Amino acid sequence: MSIPVFGLGTFRLQDQIVIDSVSQALTLGYRAIDTAQIYENEAPVGQAIQESGINRDELFITTKIWIANLSKDKLIPSLRESIQKLKTDYVDLTLIHWPSPNDEVSVAEFMSELLKAKGLGLTRQIGISNFTIDLMKQAIAAVGAEEIATNQIELSPLLQNRNVVDFAKQNGIAVTSYMTLAYGKALAEPVIKTIAEQHGATPAQVILSWAMQLGYGVIPSSTKAANLASNLLAQKLCLNAADMALIATLDRNERLVSPDGLAPKWD
């Protein structure tokens, strides 16, 4: 099994806004949807999916276990609740959203429990998010690298996270990029704008294409149908080696997501 290269993110979208975003995306041809327990939008996401009438086996639904639900007694019940909210019988991928702060719950405990959830048929694949190299090593020790479908991390032209990417690749763990556009900051980079002009593309398409050509999955979000459609077309854009080399020079380790009390010690 593998994970989709392109999907729809739903972070910060709630209620009717997320219903509209997911509905529009599905109509346009999106088939992978990324949500999380902490987004508090699993139910409206599920509603939009249900109302679309698209066969479940055509869809790839990802959710993430929040830190309050990492312990052995809470993880599987919380995932069952997520599945119920999503109005489905299973999810395709379940991630540990963040490692447990201060190791309150050990990596071995929550990864073993997540693997058990897979064994129960609640999730087809399992993975991790916001994991450093050390945390990936612990996860691999707990369940084996072959069980970890992806590490979903903040990754953009401004934060290329090469050490984490290299370690993941060496262990056969796919990388999914979130915040690929760096909250829009990367769109304003002159290098990105120039490449976009040369290809008759948008800056967002250039960045998404860059990430996909490096082998990363992407999950951009939008509430606008035009942007949803435009982002989807990034899959058809092919950047050349010179373009890729120029974007590589933009890396400045500029991390935008590092919540106090939640973020691990980054590589």
Curated annotation (Swiss-Prot):
CDD domains, A to Z: AKR_AKR3F2
PROSITE patterns per UniProt: ALDOKETO_REDUCTASE_1 (PS00798), ALDOKETO_REDUCTASE_2 (PS00062)
Reaction(s) this enzyme catalyzes, per UniProt: hydroxyacetone + NADP(+) = methylglyoxal + NADPH + H(+)
GO molecular function: aldo-keto reductase (NADPH) activity; methylglyoxal reductase (NADPH) (acetol producing) activity
One Gene Ontology cellular component annotation held by this UniProt entry: cytoplasm
Keywords: Cytoplasm, NADP, Oxidoreductase
Cellular localization per UniProt: Cytoplasm
InterPro entries given in the database record: AKR (IPR020471), Aldo/ket_reductase_CS (IPR018170), NADP_OxRdtase_dom (IPR023210), NADP_OxRdtase_dom_sf (IPR036812)
GO terms classed as biological process: L-ascorbic acid biosynthetic process; methylglyoxal catabolic process
Protein EC: 1.1.1.-
Pfam families: Aldo_ket_red
Binding-site residues for NADP(+), renumbered to this chain: 179-231
Residues engaged in binding substrate: H97
SUPFAM superfamilies associated with the record: NAD(P)-linked oxidoreductase (SSF51430)
Residues annotated as catalytic: Y39 (proton donor)
Enzyme class: oxidoreductase
Domain of life: Bacteria
Subunit structure: Monomer.
Record NCBIfam families: PRK11172.1
UniProt similarity note: Belongs to the aldo/keto reductase family.
Biological function: Aldo-keto reductase that significantly contributes to cellular methylglyoxal detoxification by catalyzing the NADPH-dependent conversion of methylglyoxal to acetol.
Protein name per its UniProtKB record: Methylglyoxal reductase DkgB
Lineage: Bacteria, Pseudomonadati, Pseudomonadota, Gammaproteobacteria, Enterobacterales
